């Protein structure tokens, strides 16, 4: 967690795919064997298409950080009503939502305006996510564009057949009651139209990082969102000691309901055990994981990481979670983490005082209904 804070602070201080065609059966040798080139073509055709859509300012910042960091195997889309912010974002595709509604001047902190802007730009949204197997929708809840547009984007993604995972922050208490109420309404809507919603409570983030200037606090929030999306994505797209595929992630995330995430790291001699303990103690993971119905675990380390160390992380989680829970885990290698290990845990089907609103069991009953929860003006 410390490096996340350090990275975010450094960032704040510094400031102030085409697919190959695959032939039919005639391309395969008569013997039934295939050349390496033919196998590579099949592999390319079968790769998971992942799209990350950043909605509003916070979502755009997440996409921008992923663009800077470099993410393997995902298309980055930034969608905003504020043209000034949008032009500064690094992304593969940019959508200026609701140009007629807002003239590119933002949503004025009104979620209704953000929703109407997204509905005006639905065709562009569908085009951006077309062909995706998995869509991440990331936003900061409480404001206008992110809160209003994220449910519209998630609904479009799910209707297109993609596994839809929303990763959102909830407001700092200091942002006021109106933003909190709007965040609650936005989260309710997202729960209705997403497979899984991962919630990052900004107030709990402050508990982890202590007192920081406002700008740096938001940078830390952006960094956590980026690490969360990147961690899940690269479980699928990057080779590792233990690889996961799209079907594995779908097993945990499809109809996962509300989830929370824990991030931990260690460079000690017992780095495997310490990184998982740090993740489990993370203020972001403000739940008793013993009641979770499933967990997704990503262990990242340098080239010196052994399979025994990675297995040690998972064994630690098995000891703490419901024995009937499903655990999917994988590892990825990052050469920059020599001598260090990072653990990311996503637990689904959880309840926490940090999660607003009703129990996720009624999600299916409200499927597709966006208009029955009011935002505050």
Swiss-Prot record:
InterPro entries: Cell_div_FtsZ, Cell_div_FtsZ_CS, EF_Hand_1_Ca_BS, FtsZ/CetZ, FtsZ_C, Tub_FtsZ_C, Tubulin/FtsZ_2-layer-sand-dom, Tubulin/FtsZ_GTPase_sf. GO terms for cellular component: cell division site; cytoplasm. Keywords: Cell cycle, Cell division, Cytoplasm, GTP-binding, Nucleotide-binding, Septation. GTP binds at residues 57-61, 144-146, 175, 179, 222. Residues 1-33 are annotated as: Disordered. GO terms for biological process: FtsZ-dependent cytokinesis; protein polymerization. GO terms for molecular function: GTP binding; GTPase activity. CDD domains: FtsZ_type1. It is found in: Cytoplasm. Pfam families: FtsZ_C, Tubulin. Gene3D superfamilies: Tubulin/FtsZ, GTPase domain (3.40.50.1440). Residues 1-16 have a biased composition (Acidic residues). Homodimer. Polymerizes to form a dynamic ring structure in a strictly GTP-dependent manner. Interacts directly with several other division proteins. Belongs to the FtsZ family. Essential cell division protein that forms a contractile ring structure (Z ring) at the future cell division site. The regulation of the ring assembly controls the timing and the location of cell division. One of the functions of the FtsZ ring is to recruit other cell division proteins to the septum to produce a new cell wall between the dividing cells. Binds GTP and shows GTPase activity. This is Cell division protein FtsZ. It comes from Haloferax mediterranei (strain ATCC 33500 / DSM 1411 / JCM 8866 / NBRC 14739 / NCIMB 2177 / R-4) (Halobacterium mediterranei).
